[in-house]
Curated annotation (Swiss-Prot):
PTM sites of type Phosphoserine: 14, 197, 243
Residues bound to Ca(2+) 4: 154, 216, 218, 224
Organism: Pongo abelii
Domain of life: Eukaryota
Localization in the cell: Nucleus; Cytoplasm; Cell membrane; Cell junction
This protein's name: Copine-3
Residues that hold Ca(2+) 3 according to the record: 154, 160, 216, 218
Domain VWFA: 291-513
Record carries keyword Nucleus: yes
InterPro entries (UniProt xref): C2_dom, C2_domain_sf, C2B_Copine, Copine, Copine_C, VWF_A, vWFA_dom_sf
One Gene Ontology molecular-function label: calcium-dependent protein binding
Keyword 4Fe-4S among UniProt keywords: no
Gene Ontology process terms (BP): cellular response to calcium ion; cellular response to growth factor stimulus; ERBB2 signaling pathway; positive regulation of cell migration
PANTHER family: COPINE, COPINE-3
Amino acid sequence: MAAQCVTKVALNVSCANLLDKDIGSKSDPLCVLFLNTSGQQWYEVERTERIKNCLNPQFSKTFIIDYYFEVVQKLKFGVYDIDNKTIELSDDDFLGECECTLGQVVSSKKLTRPLVMKNGRPAGKGSITISAEEIKDNRVVLFEMEARKPDNKDLFGKSDPYLEFHKQTSDGNWLMVHRTEVVKNNLNPVWRPFKISLNSLCYGDMDKTIKVECYDYDNDGSHDLIGTFQTTMTKLKEASRCSPVEFECINEKKRQKKKSYKNSGVISVKQCEITVECTFLDYIMGGCQLNFTVGVDFTGSNDDPRSPDSLHYISPNGVNEYLTALWSVGLVIQDYDADKMFPAFGFGAQIPPQWQVSHEFPMNFNPSNPYCNGIQGIVEAYRSCLPQIKLYGPTNFSPIINHVARFAAAAAQQQTASQYFVLLIITDGVITDLDETRQAIVNASRLPMSIIIVGVGGADFSAMEFLDGDGGGLRSPSGEVAIRDIVQFVPFRQFQNAPKEALAQCVLAEIPQQVVGYFNTYKLLPPKNPATKQQKQ
């Protein structure tokens, strides 16, 4: 029997006394959460933001985890000093790790452990603190904020202001729950609209004190406090664009020194709107269909399928990396599609009868009906197609991304959250049309679709890591930024010795939040509202 998710848990992470691996500055730490539910294989769940020049980081990124009462969920928090833009951790300095179970964190509410190196020895005096909260409230607060004339802390320029939000815990301490972006060189900063869950902000208590701090960002990590104010949600939600709520930013040290001190700037709240966000299950139970499409790389770099060295070579027991990846991901996602009819395409091969190179040919060779019956149907189409084509090139992703995007664009015209598209591309990794693919992904980020890329073989996957926006927003060649991160890349060989469900768990981990993120952004509700249905019963 499958484990039932009891609840969702939010984990906040901070570290103290980290090892300093940088010469002339301090480490730039980032925390990675790994999960293990069976065997020896750990898989990455998510990463915090990177904090520059800091040995005592408080990460604002919150890890959201499903808590299964009857499953021992082993967690590993790895801390790394990030000095480059690659997604790989092997080329970053390791600052220490901590292993525990989710049950231990939940029962402690706050767990502090020493960080240890891979050999089990202490990572200097480094420690990690993990705080856990159950998420019961799906209300979120949408903010629009700006400031006027915050104190100028920079000698040769203007301040680089950012805000931090803190809530007060039951033991009286302050816990940071959100950090805005830095607005560079600006004494009248306008921050991008942002949202914070009401539970994270104030435990859902409208009269709970919230502390907001304004800082001037410094590259060396010694951020200067401009000022602070305290308020409550009751006060904040009075704000509107017509009538903003304003707060004086007070720096206590300056106030005590100067009798004429007035303030260190004014923070203006232009919008503070509470809204209820549907969960992934609300959408699925409310009738939203996940439409699954497969794209398979048939380029010459895979080698001749008849050769045992080829990535398309089907072994005597009937498998290869392409088929294993397809089964692993497809078996999970097919449960969310009612008719289980999936379009499957190949790209990069010469196809009969003219032997022209095609970058989006149906694997069943039926252009008017490229649908296959379930994952088994896709596997059969793949096996049948392989001996009929000539592997060629180049490796172009953009045609198949644009193909799915056309269907997603049509679905985007609907007034409810009825359809979401997931494209699985399985490739050996040497991409040719990088600029066109970047543009296609940026365009698709505005549509109800996500892209999963599974890299098979041992090729250079640096281009794939570039497309996965985890290191920062992907940009088109013209500089246009993707409004959502919709690409998830995973190298297949990372999971070769893992339980068969591990690959699917990893590549599908971001899909629920991408689905929710899209529909909530456009304020689309499920076709059938589950809450309404329950009330009628």
